[in-house]
From Swiss-Prot:
Disulfide bridge map: none
Protein family per UniProt: Belongs to the DagF family.
Organism taxonomic ancestry: Bacteria, Pseudomonadati, Pseudomonadota, Gammaproteobacteria, Enterobacterales
Phenotype on disruption: Cells lacking this gene are able to grow with D-glucosaminate as the sole carbon source, although the growth rate is significantly lower.
Superkingdom: Bacteria
Protein name in UniProt: 2-dehydro-3-deoxy-phosphogluconate aldolase
Keywords from the UniProt entry: Lyase
Lyase in keyword set: yes
Name of a matching Pfam family: KDGP_aldolase
A GO MF label: 2-dehydro-3-deoxy-phosphogluconate aldolase activity
Enzyme class: lyase
Induction context: By D-glucosaminate and DgaR.
Organism: Salmonella typhimurium (strain 14028s / SGSC 2262)
Amino acid sequence: MQQINFYRQRVAINVLAKDIANAKAIYEAAEGHAVIGVLSAQFATVEEGVPEVKRWMAEVPSISVGLGAGDPAQYYKAAMIAAHTHPAHVNQTFTGSGFAAGALAATGGEQTHINALVSPTGTPGEVVISTGVSSSQGTPARVSCEAAVRMMQDMGAHAAKFFPMGGEKSLPELYALATTAARHGMTLIEPTGGISLDNFGIILQTCLEAGVPRVMPHVYSSIIDPQTGNTRPEDIIRLMEIVKALV
């Protein structure tokens, strides 16, 4: 069965891979504490995505079905691919997370972790929840972190994904969201956007200090070799060294 293997039950990293060989190398470098993203944006249809995701799942024990740069248009494909494959994790917009939870429940996929994407406002304690296909085109819906977390729980999401963070730019906001998540029994937070080897430590530390039980930072382009397109296993090893130093 697919599952997220958190280091000391606290931290896993969500990363991309060029292909299955790269995914296996990364997973090994992370000592099993990595979740490998497969993006829905690359598939024209759900039917095209399902066999490919199954192929990855057969080789890697922890697969995350992604949107692709938080693209809200991918919410349906991501949810339905996940419902047909039951990966360890699926990424969702805030508004799409309930749909994904329903699709997974209907197919016996309750073990799949679902996140709900909220965005920074510039004000700690408030987030934007209008991250869906239509809502992202209209007036931004700013709500308190508490309202956002409680609504995620109502919809069946397990985690708050905070994107785009812009690296350290949104640290006070991340801390506010993480403390709120912890206070209301949400067990996972996923900081995303502009995370690199240089700021990974401070971002992870911020979440851990907030008291949220589990953290899964998404680290993408900063650890991908632009020449080969491969995520660098040596960078994964360095990320894990930071994790071990902080947990």
